[in-house]
Amino acid sequence: IATYTSLGATIKNIEMPHADYGIATYYIIAPCEASSNLARYDGAHYGYRTDHAELVEDGTDEGPLVRMYRRTRSEGFGAEVQRRIMLGTYALSEGYYDAFYLKALKVRRLIRQDYDNAFGEVDMIIGPVTANAAFSKGEKTSDPMAMYLEDLYTVTANLAGVAGISLPCGFTKSGLPIGLQLQAAPFQEEKLLRAAQMFQNATDFHTRRPEL
């Protein structure tokens, strides 16, 4: 913020009343979209297909076609993708569609309205990319909720369809990188990239490399 102030920017605090609902909303809508879009990847029409040698009977009552579908999707999708497909299928199922998916769409509309109101007052929104510094690879794979919470500051941009970019802006005492996030109104990518370039021209964080 100090860098942009030195470049002539005027800083103003804004309110985003529905930002706290971003994680819950995103992780209903995104899995629903994943479940719907990835349903076509069955090994017969699109994408990866399991090896024919793997289609031998395995003691189940499944026919060869169902067995091919199951093994193709089990082998072709990673654990996180499978988790999202299951979440999305559940949220879209009868009895839960209205309670989860439709309600999430209504909240997304409120989040978009928050952004519209904010961009009526400012040209750009600035903030952190994540609440914490980077964690070690694989550190939180056993705790999906902890990983999802790291998306708190970025998912609202995806929900609202606004332009966003992240930039390196510093390091922790232990040398872990810290990210700066800029957001601009829809279709204002040129303004966003210009603001990002101004920051990089005034700093050298993007040129630093960690010691390996």
Placement of each model-derived feature along the sequence:
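Short, surface-exposed loop/helix-turn segments at secondary-structure junctions
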Residues: 24, 57-67, 99, 103, ...
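Structural helix-boundary/capping segments
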Residues: 1-10, 45-52, 82-113, 121, ...
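Short acidic, glycine/serine/threonine-rich loops at helix termini
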Residues: 23-27, 50, 137-138, 176-179
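Gly/Ser-rich, acidic/histidine-flanked active-site/gating loops
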Residues: 1-35, 40, 44, 171
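Glycine-rich phosphate/pyrophosphate-binding loop
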Residues: 48-51, 58-81
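Short, hinge-like loop/turn segments at secondary-structure boundaries
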Residues: 28-32, 144-145, 183-184
